[in-house]
Amino acid sequence: MGDGGLPKILSIKGDDKKAAYLRNLYRTVYLSDIYERYEIENKAEFEELVRILASSVGSPVNPTNLANTFKSVKKLNNITDKTIEAYIGYLENAYMIEKADRYDIKGRKYIGTTPKYYFKDLGLRNAILSFRQTEENHLMENVVYNEMRYRGFLVDVGNVNIRVKTEEGKWQRVTLEVDFVCNLGSRRYYLQSAYRLPDEEKMQQEKRSLQQIGDSFKKIVIVGERMKLRRDDNGIVQMGIYEFLTYSELIDA
């Protein structure tokens, strides 16, 4: 998850040389191409946005909130939500990031708010942050996303709306999240990425949204360790990230 999967990186020996290659690639190829193609004047602000996206993999992205941050913290009034949207579009066109739209599973419709963005190559993402932010849970989530895209699936972020009773006896609407809703033809999988499941409480927390989905498609929790495939009484599958990446047929087991 540290060096990514760009072809040339495999032939470079030594962590320092790999890091230097990725940093140079980011600046001399990706940034240079984007600046030339789109004639960006606010280069420092653009690069700050790239760092924000790199540090928030797996988090919802709201252009309005980001623009307000630039305005309040950086004192920049010329970076609007439309500017942020345009900059993100440039990164998508450069194949640096990819958007996962938000999908209402029970309502069977897309929700046009707070998508998530994942980096096409994690080595490049890590180089952008000078290899200082390597949170395994976020990186693993990005790996799972990339793997399902590599297998040809359309990958969205899922919402499951439920009603729960409060301590005061009132009914309240709660939105639970499914990390990934993966579709390919008639096939669909619901995936949760959980780097660590230290106890039963955490396991039930990860399964909660999956348990609220009322269809028969496969529901899988992927954990950040080697693990033989398990299946609970509700049919929810648990498997390790190594097995998930190595044996593609396991998701159909």
Please identify what each model-predicted range represents.
Residues 1-60:
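Interdomain motor-coupling "hinge/lid" segment immediately C-terminal to the ATP-binding subdomain
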Residues 13, 41, 63-66, 100-102:
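Short coil/turn segments at secondary-structure boundaries
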Residues 18, 22, 42, 80, ...:
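Hydrophobic (often cysteine-bearing) scaffold residues that line and stabilize catalytic clefts
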Residues 51-55, 71, 149:
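Short, locally clustered residues in the helix-turn-helix/winged-helix DNA-binding domain
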Residues 83-90, 95-253:
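A cross-kingdom feature that marks ATP-driven nucleic-acid transaction machinery
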